[in-house]
Amino acid sequence: MDFNLTIAVVALPLFMFLFLGLAGVKMGRKLTGVLGVIGQGVTTVLAYGLALTYFFGTGQGQIVDGVRQTIIVADWSWLNLGDKVMANIGFELDPIAAMMLIVITTISFFVHLYSLGYMSDHDGNAEKGFQRYYAFLALFTFSMLGMVVATNIFQIFVFFEMVGVSSYLLIGFYYSSPAAIHASKKAFIVTRLADFFFLFGVIVLGFAVSTLTNLVPEGGSALSFSTLLSNPEAIASQLGAVEFFGIPALPLSLICIFIGGAGKSAMYPLHI
């Protein structure tokens, strides 16, 4: 199986979001749901195929010196944020990404399937806004998949934001219900606070690593995982001497990124 299908695994839910969001109103509600399930089913099958090929295939993804190799499927230039701080858009497979593709697509498939009945009334008729619901589910799936195959930490932040937006849209799906409106607003506000810390942590980390000119290769980016993981011991050691306005940069960035993740996952005390 071609590892370029990683792109298809991520792009198919995006296509389903656009297709169901734009054309769903022209189709029957049940047909929209069935197409959503089929689309997610295809995505899930592709994800399993990719993971099996990565872990058990020959060639790429082999274990070298006890470490299974990371595969950069694609990496396109996007934003130049400063000297040695570039934000690209790309796709990479490593053991964690391959496993998370399976986890995300499997759970999403069963959510799509379960929703066919859950989002119907006692007579089996799909609820109003059924097409919109399945479009939002596809967007949510796309956002999570894009995050786990990211090649750099800034791309993770971008998809991290998209997860927050799609969560807000799903929580507030019943927009005529005061309780749903209140819950969606509360979730949106709390996650925006978390997003601020995450972004600030990314900025501090990018600034700090970019100062290590001997460890960031020419044409490389301080935000890319290939740079951050190329020599983690040396990077961590040298970052200990880097400060951000008088504050040690490494612990500051890691604490901020942790708060971002904690807020997004509603960990205490951001569980309100």
Regions found by a protein language model. Give the residues of each.
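...captures the hydrophobic TM-helix bundle architecture rather than a specific catalytic motif
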Residues: 1-272
